[in-house]
Amino acid sequence: MVELEDLPNVGAKTAQKLRDAGFGDMMRLATATAKELSVKAEIGEGVAEKVIEAARRAEKIDFETAFDVMERRKDVGRITTGSKALDELIGGGIETQAITEVFGEFGSGKSQLSHELAVTVQLPEERGGLDAEAVFIDTENTFRPERIEQIANAFELDLEEVLNKIHIARAFNSSHQILMAEKVNELIQEGKNIRLVIVDSLTAHFRAEYVGREALATRQQKLNQHLHTLQNIANTYNAAVFVTNQVQARPDAFFGSPTKAIGGHVLGHAATYRIWLKKGLAGKRIARLVDSPHLPEGECVFKITTAGIVD
C-alpha cells in the first residue's frame, strides 16, 4: 500500500498537513482539486497539483474499458428501503457509489425513508443491508431517536447498538452543512465503517440564506461544491449518499406537475437517481422514479407504519 510519504514532493510535514485536512486516503487525494487541496491543507497550489498528479499515478487513474467498469460495478452495494416494491423500482435498493435524491411535499415520507435507511444499512447483506454505519446530517431538526427505536424493534435489532452506529450532525447553516459533509472523511479514517451518508434536507439552508435572483449564482456554486464533496465520498468509500429535497410551486405550469424540485440543473445533473414522493389515499405513498442512468421511469406504492416502510 502506497503511503503519503512515498509520493514525490511529500515530506513528513506535508503528509501531516494532508492527513489533518482529511486527505489521508490516497483515492480522496487523487480526486481532489488543486484549489481545494491548497486551501484546506494550507500548501501552495503548485505543490497541490504535483501531489494530486502523483496520487493519481499511484492509484492508476486513467482510461479503462467498459468491461473494467462492469467489473467494478460488481462491488456496488444496495440498501433495502424496507419495501420490496420500492427496492425493485430502483434496481434493488439505494445504491452505493451514487447520490439518490428524493423530493416531495411536506409529509410525503422523505424523513421517514431517511430514518429507515439509517437502520437498514446496519443489517447484514443477506437481509438487505451493508453491515455498516450511517452519517445523518440533519438540517431541519427532523432526526428522532424514538423513530429509530420503532424501526430497530421491527427488525429485532439491539437498540443501543443501532443508535451508536448512527452519527448525527446537526447543521445550523449552509456553511456548517458543507463542513460536516467534509468531516465524514475524518470519521472514516478513524475506523468508522460509514457506508451511508444522509442529508435531510439538502437544500433547506441554501434556499433560506440565498434569496433572490442576485444570490442565485452564489447559491448554486456552493450547492455544487457540497454535491461534489458528497459524490467524492460515494466514489472513494463505496458509500451511498441519500439526500432529501424540497419542492416549490410552478405558477406558470398549465400542464404536468404544479411543483418542481429545488436545486435546478446543478442538483438535477449531480443526482444519479431522482425519486418523487407523493401522498396517496389511505395513508399510502407513491414513489415515482423520474431519473436514472439505466432504469426506466416507473411508480410503486408503499406504506409508512409504526414498524417503518412496508409494502
UniProtKB/Swiss-Prot annotation:
Binding positions for ATP per the UniProt entry: G104, E105, F106, G107, S108, G109, K110, S111
Matching Pfam families: HHH_5, Rad51
Single GO MF annotation: ATP binding
Alphabetical GO biological process terms: DNA recombination; DNA repair
Keyword Ion transport on entry: no
Keywords: ATP-binding, DNA damage, DNA recombination, DNA-binding, Nucleotide-binding
NCBIfam families xrefs: PRK04301.1, recomb_radA
General function of this protein: Involved in DNA repair and in homologous recombination. Binds and assemble on single-stranded DNA to form a nucleoprotein filament. Hydrolyzes ATP in a ssDNA-dependent manner and promotes DNA strand exchange between homologous DNA molecules.
Family note: Belongs to the eukaryotic RecA-like protein family.
Name of the featured protein: DNA repair and recombination protein RadA
